[in-house]
């Protein structure tokens, strides 16, 4: 194994960390209606917990309203209850086979809570990135100990690991700042 192979093994894992962070913050309310708000909602359907996406179609009606079109009419009340119980501060209202979900404006206090949550998710992701960098450096050091690479290659590999970490941390910081602006926008 070479330093390049170690790099190629770790880089996709760092990308996945960024993608996971993006998915995580997509469900944080910003005051605007997005279908991602309901991604984590689970509905008690047919004797099991199912993601909301599997019992109906979610779409944005306007800036402050989502519409959930339920495929099975018997699931309307369970879906409405699941949205209400998801602790998202949303108020669903059944309308035939559809559920209208009004997105109330966020209070200043709630916005600050969401910013804090975004920063927490960001810090957790940064820790994951640093752990991946550590793993990369450990693998490079093992290669050097087994004489598979030279000391110069080891040092270059460590430098590459630091640069890769810096690149992904910068990307993460930009995502955090963007989400904070989105949340604080009134």
Swiss-Prot record:
Gene Ontology CC terms: cytoplasm
CDD domains, A to Z: RRF
An individual GO BP term: translational termination
Pfam families cross-referenced by the UniProt entry: RRF
Assigned keywords, A-Z: Cytoplasm, Protein biosynthesis
Compartments it resides in: Cytoplasm
Superkingdom assignment: Bacteria
Record has Protein biosynthesis as a keyword: yes
Molecular-function GO term, any one: ribosomal large subunit binding
Family: Belongs to the RRF family.
Protein task: Responsible for the release of ribosomes from messenger RNA at the termination of protein biosynthesis. May increase the efficiency of translation by recycling ribosomes from one round of translation to another.
NCBIfam families assigned: frr
Stated name of the protein: Ribosome-recycling factor
Organism of this sequence: Pelodictyon phaeoclathratiforme (strain DSM 5477 / BU-1)
Gene name in the database record: frr
């Amino acid at each position: 194994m070479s330093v390049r192979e170690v790099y190629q093994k770790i880089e996709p894992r760092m990308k996945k960390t960024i993608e996971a962070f993006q998915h995580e913050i997509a469900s944080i309310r910003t005051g605007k209606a997005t279908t991602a708000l309901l991604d984590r909602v689970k509905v008690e359907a047919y004797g099991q917990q199912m993601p909301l996406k599997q019992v109906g179609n979610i779409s944005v009606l306007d800036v402050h309203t989502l519409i959930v079109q339920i495929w099975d009419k018997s699931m309307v009340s369970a879906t409405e209850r699941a949205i209400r119980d998801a602790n998202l501060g949303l108020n669903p209202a059944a309308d035939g086979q559809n559920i209208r979900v009004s997105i109330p404006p966020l209070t200043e206090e709630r916005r600050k809570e969401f910013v804090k949550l975004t920063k927490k998710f960001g810090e957790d992701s940064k820790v994951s990135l640093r752990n991946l960098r550590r793993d990369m450096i450990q693998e490079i050091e093992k290669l050097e100990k087994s004489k598979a690479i030279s000391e110069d290659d080891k040092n270059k590999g460590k430098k590459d690991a630091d640069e890769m970490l810096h690149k992904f941390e910068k990307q993460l910081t930009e995502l955090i700042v963007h989400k904070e602006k989105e949340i604080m926008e009134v």
